[in-house]
Amino acid sequence: MKMPKNAPPRTKKHSNGTQNGPLNQNLPSLLIGTGEHKELVMQMPLSTRDGNGRHGLKLAEPVQRGLSPWLNPTQLNRPTFLMNFPFSYATGSPNNPWMKDLPDQKRAPDFKRAAVQFLQVYQNISAEGLVYLLPTPRDGDLQDLLYTANLGIVLEHLPDKNTVVISNFKSPPRRGETPLGVKFFQDMGYNVHVAPAKFEGEAELKHLYDNIYVGGYGIRSEIETYEWMEQTFDMRIIKVQEVEKYLYHLDCSIFPITKENTLVGTELFTKKEVRELAKFTNIIPVSVDECFSGICNSVRLPNQVLNSSHIHDLKAGTQDYQYEITKNRKLEDICSNLAMEVAYFNLSEFHKSGALLSCMVMHLNRHCYKIALTA
């Protein structure tokens, strides 16, 4: 296009209309946030023809922030979860007995297969609610970041639905996840706390109902964490000691399937601990073998329980096949009695790091448990 003879020379301007200089203080702007996290948002000039006047571009009117009834995902009236795509997944630092039992060549993951297996779980959960994906930093050595159940716990019983406790990892390869989790939830506007003693997330602390939780300690988490939580957040935590080194997180041996019923590997705890837990929930006993096969490593959706099963990779008639089919039938019977179905996912690539399905999912709320089903 030919420039008019009397037109002024073109100069490069910032989006706020200033020419290579500081922000124009006369332009409308918004301040978002509080304290040191305030963010300045400038209004952009209109670029449409109708916005051009004889004195130059007309500025857009200041716009108020949307008055959403929700401040964060936890407050949504639908199931909400946090997952992480396995961009940084690796098995180079064996940090649990399952990994140490595997030779290096059998522990190496098939990344394409891992991606397919992850997406099958993700697609199923996202069909029932909102799934946030935790970003993976490019320069981080975070082999277990995809196991978001260990990142922390959102405290369901607090009325503001805005408080999260981030993990203080015992496992050295996972300690870099703590600052990442703090930043993620701070950016989302949560009140963020870091556990003062060792603690590895909701995989170790299961919500039952109201302010009642059950917490596991002794291998990856410390009892001092739960004492601090009780004093700080008005919680009642039934504390149970974990002693089986292969079942090193509580989600391996306890699974609240409804607000009233909880699967418990009763042989893994003392009689006193089981009696105390029975005061608060109806215990559905499961065997040690069923725990080893992952019956408690499940995730509850509104009318469905998700569980990992690689039974089609196993040879019929073998001991491993028998363990797996026994676990599956037990879970199906339990779910049938509670008017729920079971959905199975082959997560064999994640077995290489000692993980099952519940490890991959962090609850941002417990809306699924508000739905009562009747058989």
PLM region descriptions:
Residues 2-4, 10, 17, 21-375:
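The feature marks the mature, well-folded catalytic cores of soluble enzymes
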